Amino acid sequence: GHRVALAALMLTVAAFFWRHLLTSDVLFFRDIASVHYPRAVELRSVLRDGLLPVWNPFEHFGEPVTANPNYLLFYPTTWLAWVLPPAYGFKLHYILHFFVLAAGSFFLARRAGLGPFPCYVAGAVFVFSGPILSLGNFYNLLPTTAWMPLVVLAADYQMRRGGWKGAGVFAAALTLQLFAGEPLTSIASVGLALGWALVFYGDFHAPFWAGANRRVFTRFVSG
């Protein structure tokens, strides 16, 4: 069933990234080697000196970290380079989000009513598409994109359940995506989620601001 298809999808992604998961191979293209990995090591050094990583003394004679969204200070996978061997923890920040992308696409396809194999295909085609693979060197754009299917799923949950629980799930997904530091992708995710909600819960035969469509906008905004 769907569990077997999801497991097969996760194994497919793992097979694609096996060298990065099982060997000492590192990521290096573009800003990875020149900007983001050095910053991860610098903040790890700050932490090991017993200081909070809110100021980076190694860049530009010192610069604030919390004011620069490119540090992703509040995003959980950023911390992997601080608690694991830095090179491995740092590349996990990238690789784990391909798993998130695949899983999110899979669950979104399942929510749309597709069977196990079509869900597998949806996840595989999305995660291995050219545009997605090309994000593999973007420290913030990859994680924010990885959250897009999950933000849509959270919006769908909000439409079905409503109340504080539904709003909380949607707000949590959107907040984590915002912590990944690329706000334009978050804006696009909200637009995509609203489109999903109108397709599955709206009424194209009713006036735009009436009936089911009005309920969609009201519940969406309340989340």
Positions of predicted regions on the chain:
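Membrane-interface starts of transmembrane alpha-helices
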Residues: G1-V4, P85-H93, L114-A122, G166
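Short, charged, surface-exposed loops that flank catalytic or proteolytic processing sites
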Residues: G163, A210-N213
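Cytoplasmic membrane-interface regions of multi-pass membrane proteins
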Residues: F204-W209
